[in-house]
From Swiss-Prot:
Its EC number is 4.2.1.19. The lineage of its organism: Archaea, Methanobacteriati, Methanobacteriota, Methanomada group, Methanococci. Gene3D superfamilies: Imidazole glycerol phosphate dehydratase, domain 1 (3.30.230.40). GO terms for molecular function: imidazoleglycerol-phosphate dehydratase activity. Belongs to the imidazoleglycerol-phosphate dehydratase family. HAMAP family: HisB. This is Imidazoleglycerol-phosphate dehydratase. It is an enzyme of class 4 (lyase). One of its GO terms (biological process) is L-histidine biosynthetic process.
Length: 190
Protein backbone atom coordinates (compact mmCIF):
# COMPACT_ATOMS: atom_id res chain seq x y z
CA UNK A 1 0.00 0.00 0.00
CA UNK A 2 1.31 3.44 -0.94
CA UNK A 3 0.09 5.68 1.86
CA UNK A 4 1.63 8.92 3.06
CA UNK A 5 1.11 11.45 5.84
CA UNK A 6 2.21 15.05 5.50
CA UNK A 7 1.92 17.73 8.15
CA UNK A 8 2.74 21.39 7.57
CA UNK A 9 2.44 24.11 10.21
CA UNK A 10 3.23 27.73 9.36
CA UNK A 11 2.06 31.09 10.67
CA UNK A 12 -0.52 31.07 7.85
CA UNK A 13 -1.83 27.49 7.78
CA UNK A 14 -1.90 24.25 9.70
CA UNK A 15 -2.40 21.25 7.44
CA UNK A 16 -2.68 17.51 8.08
CA UNK A 17 -2.95 15.20 5.06
CA UNK A 18 -3.27 11.44 4.84
CA UNK A 19 -3.16 10.09 1.28
CA UNK A 20 -3.57 6.48 0.17
CA UNK A 21 -2.74 6.32 -3.53
CA UNK A 22 -4.06 2.75 -3.71
CA UNK A 23 -7.40 3.68 -2.22
CA UNK A 24 -11.01 3.51 -3.32
CA UNK A 25 -11.95 7.18 -3.39
CA UNK A 26 -12.95 7.67 0.26
CA UNK A 27 -12.41 11.17 1.56
CA UNK A 28 -12.84 13.51 4.49
CA UNK A 29 -11.86 17.02 3.46
CA UNK A 30 -12.14 20.24 5.43
CA UNK A 31 -10.30 23.31 4.17
CA UNK A 32 -12.74 25.91 5.47
CA UNK A 33 -13.65 26.73 1.85
CA UNK A 34 -16.76 24.77 0.80
CA UNK A 35 -16.17 24.88 -2.97
CA UNK A 36 -12.51 23.89 -2.53
CA UNK A 37 -13.68 20.95 -0.36
CA UNK A 38 -16.05 19.99 -3.18
CA UNK A 39 -13.46 19.94 -5.97
CA UNK A 40 -10.83 18.21 -3.82
CA UNK A 41 -13.47 15.58 -3.02
CA UNK A 42 -14.04 15.16 -6.77
CA UNK A 43 -10.27 14.73 -7.22
CA UNK A 44 -10.19 12.01 -4.55
CA UNK A 45 -13.31 10.20 -5.77
CA UNK A 46 -12.41 10.13 -9.46
CA UNK A 47 -8.74 9.40 -8.79
CA UNK A 48 -9.67 6.57 -6.38
CA UNK A 49 -7.42 8.14 -3.74
CA UNK A 50 -8.30 7.91 -0.06
CA UNK A 51 -7.79 11.39 1.37
CA UNK A 52 -8.08 12.80 4.86
CA UNK A 53 -7.33 16.51 4.76
CA UNK A 54 -7.71 19.05 7.54
CA UNK A 55 -6.68 22.65 6.91
CA UNK A 56 -6.83 25.57 9.29
CA UNK A 57 -5.89 28.66 7.33
CA UNK A 58 -5.93 32.42 7.75
CA UNK A 59 -9.25 32.76 5.94
CA UNK A 60 -9.90 36.02 7.78
CA UNK A 61 -7.37 37.48 5.32
CA UNK A 62 -8.40 35.55 2.20
CA UNK A 63 -8.20 32.04 0.73
CA UNK A 64 -4.79 32.38 -0.96
CA UNK A 65 -2.60 30.73 1.70
CA UNK A 66 -5.08 27.90 2.29
CA UNK A 67 -5.26 27.01 -1.40
CA UNK A 68 -1.52 27.46 -2.00
CA UNK A 69 -0.40 25.44 1.03
CA UNK A 70 -2.87 22.66 0.25
CA UNK A 71 -1.24 22.36 -3.18
CA UNK A 72 2.19 22.26 -1.52
CA UNK A 73 1.20 19.49 0.91
CA UNK A 74 -0.61 17.39 -1.71
CA UNK A 75 2.41 17.78 -3.98
CA UNK A 76 4.81 16.66 -1.24
CA UNK A 77 2.70 13.54 -0.65
CA UNK A 78 2.76 12.56 -4.32
CA UNK A 79 6.47 13.37 -4.58
CA UNK A 80 7.06 10.66 -1.96
CA UNK A 81 5.90 7.78 -4.16
CA UNK A 82 8.38 5.23 -5.43
CA UNK A 83 9.08 6.10 -9.08
CA UNK A 84 10.02 2.54 -10.09
CA UNK A 85 7.37 0.44 -11.80
CA UNK A 86 4.73 3.13 -12.34
CA UNK A 87 3.09 4.23 -15.57
CA UNK A 88 4.59 7.74 -15.12
CA UNK A 89 2.28 9.40 -17.68
CA UNK A 90 -1.41 10.13 -17.27
CA UNK A 91 -4.08 12.10 -19.05
CA UNK A 92 -7.80 12.79 -19.02
CA UNK A 93 -10.34 14.76 -21.02
CA UNK A 94 -13.46 15.36 -18.95
CA UNK A 95 -16.67 17.14 -19.98
CA UNK A 96 -19.14 18.65 -17.55
CA UNK A 97 -22.11 20.04 -19.42
CA UNK A 98 -20.71 22.91 -21.54
CA UNK A 99 -17.26 22.79 -19.89
CA UNK A 100 -14.30 20.60 -20.83
CA UNK A 101 -11.00 20.04 -19.04
CA UNK A 102 -7.90 18.37 -20.42
CA UNK A 103 -5.05 17.35 -18.11
CA UNK A 104 -1.75 15.65 -18.96
CA UNK A 105 0.78 14.57 -16.33
CA UNK A 106 4.38 13.37 -16.36
CA UNK A 107 5.76 12.16 -13.03
CA UNK A 108 9.28 12.59 -14.34
CA UNK A 109 10.93 14.65 -11.61
CA UNK A 110 10.83 17.88 -13.64
CA UNK A 111 8.33 20.39 -12.25
CA UNK A 112 6.67 22.49 -14.91
CA UNK A 113 3.15 23.79 -15.33
CA UNK A 114 1.29 25.06 -18.36
CA UNK A 115 -2.21 26.03 -17.27
CA UNK A 116 -4.80 27.54 -19.57
CA UNK A 117 -7.74 28.69 -17.51
CA UNK A 118 -9.47 32.02 -17.94
CA UNK A 119 -12.11 32.61 -15.28
CA UNK A 120 -15.27 34.53 -16.12
CA UNK A 121 -15.88 35.40 -12.45
CA UNK A 122 -13.63 36.29 -9.52
CA UNK A 123 -15.27 33.93 -7.03
CA UNK A 124 -17.14 30.66 -6.74
CA UNK A 125 -18.69 31.01 -3.31
CA UNK A 126 -15.75 32.15 -1.18
CA UNK A 127 -13.17 30.46 -3.44
CA UNK A 128 -11.09 32.90 -5.52
CA UNK A 129 -10.80 31.65 -9.10
CA UNK A 130 -7.39 33.32 -9.45
CA UNK A 131 -6.10 30.61 -7.11
CA UNK A 132 -6.90 27.74 -9.50
CA UNK A 133 -3.68 28.05 -11.49
CA UNK A 134 -1.73 28.88 -8.32
CA UNK A 135 -2.92 25.65 -6.65
CA UNK A 136 -1.57 23.64 -9.57
CA UNK A 137 1.71 25.61 -9.59
CA UNK A 138 2.17 24.74 -5.92
CA UNK A 139 1.27 21.11 -6.57
CA UNK A 140 3.49 20.72 -9.64
CA UNK A 141 6.53 22.32 -8.00
CA UNK A 142 6.27 20.16 -4.89
CA UNK A 143 5.27 16.89 -6.57
CA UNK A 144 7.99 17.49 -9.18
CA UNK A 145 5.59 16.72 -12.01
CA UNK A 146 5.14 18.25 -15.43
CA UNK A 147 1.48 19.16 -15.88
CA UNK A 148 -0.46 20.75 -18.69
CA UNK A 149 -4.12 21.63 -18.47
CA UNK A 150 -6.67 23.51 -20.49
CA UNK A 151 -10.21 24.40 -19.49
CA UNK A 152 -13.01 25.73 -21.69
CA UNK A 153 -16.64 26.54 -20.93
CA UNK A 154 -18.90 29.21 -19.51
CA UNK A 155 -20.00 28.08 -16.05
CA UNK A 156 -17.15 28.57 -13.57
CA UNK A 157 -18.30 25.79 -11.25
CA UNK A 158 -18.41 23.31 -14.14
CA UNK A 159 -15.00 24.39 -15.45
CA UNK A 160 -13.16 24.02 -12.16
CA UNK A 161 -14.94 20.81 -11.16
CA UNK A 162 -14.15 19.23 -14.55
CA UNK A 163 -10.51 20.26 -14.07
CA UNK A 164 -10.20 18.62 -10.65
CA UNK A 165 -11.91 15.43 -11.89
CA UNK A 166 -9.50 15.27 -14.84
CA UNK A 167 -6.60 15.93 -12.44
CA UNK A 168 -7.65 12.97 -10.29
CA UNK A 169 -8.05 10.62 -13.25
CA UNK A 170 -4.72 11.65 -14.81
CA UNK A 171 -2.85 11.25 -11.50
CA UNK A 172 -4.47 7.86 -10.95
CA UNK A 173 -3.32 6.74 -14.40
CA UNK A 174 0.24 8.05 -13.92
CA UNK A 175 0.67 6.43 -10.49
CA UNK A 176 -0.62 2.99 -11.50
CA UNK A 177 1.87 0.18 -10.94
CA UNK A 178 3.47 -1.33 -14.03
CA UNK A 179 5.94 -4.05 -13.12
CA UNK A 180 7.06 -4.43 -16.76
CA UNK A 181 8.87 -1.13 -16.98
CA UNK A 182 11.15 -0.61 -13.98
CA UNK A 183 12.29 3.01 -14.04
CA UNK A 184 10.40 4.67 -16.88
CA UNK A 185 13.28 6.77 -18.16
CA UNK A 186 16.10 6.16 -20.61
CA UNK A 187 18.31 8.03 -18.09
CA UNK A 188 17.79 5.23 -15.59
CA UNK A 189 16.59 7.65 -12.90
CA UNK A 190 13.61 9.89 -12.22
Amino acid sequence: MRAFKVKRDTNETKIHLELNIDGTGKYSINTGIPFFNHVLSSFAKHGAFDVILDVLGDLEIDDHHTVEDTGIVLGKAFESIEKNNIKRFGFAIIPMDEAKATVTIDIGGRPYLVGKYNPNTEKIGNFSTENVVHFFESFSNNAKVNMHFEVTGENEHHKVEALFKAFGIAMDMATQPDERKGIVSTKGII
